[in-house]
Amino acid sequence: NLSLSKTASTISGLAYMLNQNHLYWGATLPFSNVYLFIPLFFLAILKISRNENWWWPWGSLIGAYGLAAAETQIVFYTFVTGFLWALFLKYNTKSWKPILGYFSISAIGAILAKFWLLPVLNYLKFTTRGAALSFSDLAYDFMRIADPLRFFYPYIQLPQFTGWENLGIVPNYYIGALTFLLAIASIFLVRKNKMVAFWSGVVAFSLLVRIKWTGIFWVIHFLPGFDRFRGVFHWAFIGSFALALLAGFALDNLEKIKESRHFKRFISGLKIFALTNIIFVVIIFFIGFFRDKILNGIFKFFDAKVYQNTRQFPLEHYHGVITSEFNKFLDALSFSNYHFLISFLSVLIAILIFVLYQKNKIDFTNFKKIALVFVFLNLVLIWQGYYEFISQSKITNYPNTVSFIKNHYPQDYRYRFFRFYPPESYQEFGVFDVKDWTDYKLK
């Protein structure tokens, strides 16, 4: 439908469905319902612009599905981006059909989904979304300085430099090493391909909105509808879809990209990046030999410069936290860590494939075949062990607190107990301030 080859379409599909954001939220039904809705909604508008009239009713059903079943904030962002998509297609086709189709399927979809929308709108005034949220409550997950590393190393977490998955600060960027490099290479097509230019703009916005100092999230907070939603990570759903499409466009047009006078510089940049990765890993390896001396130096600095600004728990507490995080840092970048090993090899092999193609060691046809196999293996191997298993005893055996409650309440009162704290409970116990993520564990 976007004039992509079967190989490019397959790679885009793999990158979209198996990207990190989908893996992270896949177990949550409203989020998993978004996966199908996003591509189908854009597809419906595209089909309508091409005079395929069957997509008017199909598009209405897709709109209703999104409104009734998917996560509202992401659906809202999809509708906003969908309007821009319709404007883009109107400009390309010189027809008003994309605009008319967009408003028609949106309106009819809303009517079909009214069984859910009307009760929600009626109840909305009793919720925190009944009025505009203050900006200080809106964003808590802006991109940290080292978060871009997760485009290549999806499991890496560096204290104070990356977001923390276990705290809901979700830096989910990974779509595969080669697919991300292909998406970057699509920049060479921006002036030649309007479709690539549009989706490149979507990617750029979805990334810039997550950077605090750009002020974009603050600006759109003043627009109707946007002021009811919080958390910039929701834009990752749109961004990952756009990145996957760009990877497909780049693959099919790689011969044109190779003709660019800047392509050699691109390859040189990849070589430097590969060498930097290797050097960094070697440095981390040798740091392990001086672990104790480095930790002692960190302890001295913390005791002299940082301790007075904390809650001044016993020093042993802070030293234990520092040791724990330092060990996690070393382990995260160790070849004994399966996920790091796969990530590291994926980066080097992806760059090697580009280098061999640039040097004419492999032709375009073989590049596509190798890319398909590599992307599949990369995305399958990298997510092995992503979902951790919980011991059955954690569920079937009552903790002491639950046993006490069950033994001291009347037997005819039927209670069900869930032993795990919901995500927000750490706020209630003062582990850290939700508006200040920098003090995790150190206060």
Named regions from a protein language model:
Residues 1-443:
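Conserved luminal/periplasmic juxtamembrane motif of membrane-embedded glycan-processing enzymes
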